[in-house]
Amino acid sequence: MSGLVMGTPWMLQLERPVESRPGSQLVTRSKHYPYAGGVSEYTQRSDEELIQPIILLVDREDPAGEHHGIAAAALASVQAFLRDPENPDWQDWSSAAFGKTVRRADAKMFAKVLAAFPEHALVEVGEGRAAGLPPMPAAALPKLLAKLQVSGTQLPRGEPLPPAPLTIVLNASLEMSTGKAAAQAAHALFAWVLESKPGTVEAWVADGFPLSVLELPAKEFRKGARKSAGPVIQDAGRTEIEPGSTTAYVSATKVR
């Protein structure tokens, strides 16, 4: 929790609705929700577009379990924002494509990223480790980040996470790679933070960011989505899955 700015409203003011953002993912719920989920990591971007890098540790010798890595990536995305929510880059980023890029690094490269970007938010969930950074120009990522791979990121199944008051639910029928699932999980958790009341988020932060990850088959996923605690993420379908596929949402049981 060190370094997080508490008592600060984190509702970002967006200049245009999600429908007008080319290449963005949609976020759906019973009411209109104005936050885009993000463009694909492989989509060509404009020179001005900002993207949030999330670096996932994929240790060659002892890789983390998949759910641990997914949870760490989602929390790293959110904690990077909560550390400095008044950074104007967040406003510019949220008013555009709202994109995230999950890139993998081995232990040596991961350490280099942490040293090179002191503004990172480092998260450990069980065996999983990930670092979230503030948004930066997508077309001009620092070389250290640009050379990190995106496609083919896969962690072994590993042990499941224990139940938690907040759970990211993923659509298992889509058979997403770890990298794809991590990006969708980050979209869902970030959307929950932005839509929730500040007091709800602060209570979750004060409790130590409890989070679990659950995968459900399509029928159960759709049923649970009707009672989600936040927006249901719908993918633009540029990689791995069909356009319009619903990928992730947050389920809350005890978060105030």
Predicted features by range, described:
Residues 1-36:
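N-terminal amphipathic/basic-hydrophobic helices that include classical n-h-c signal peptides
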Residues 10, 29-212, 218-227, 231-256:
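Positively charged, small/polar-rich N-terminal and surface patches that mediate targeting and assembly
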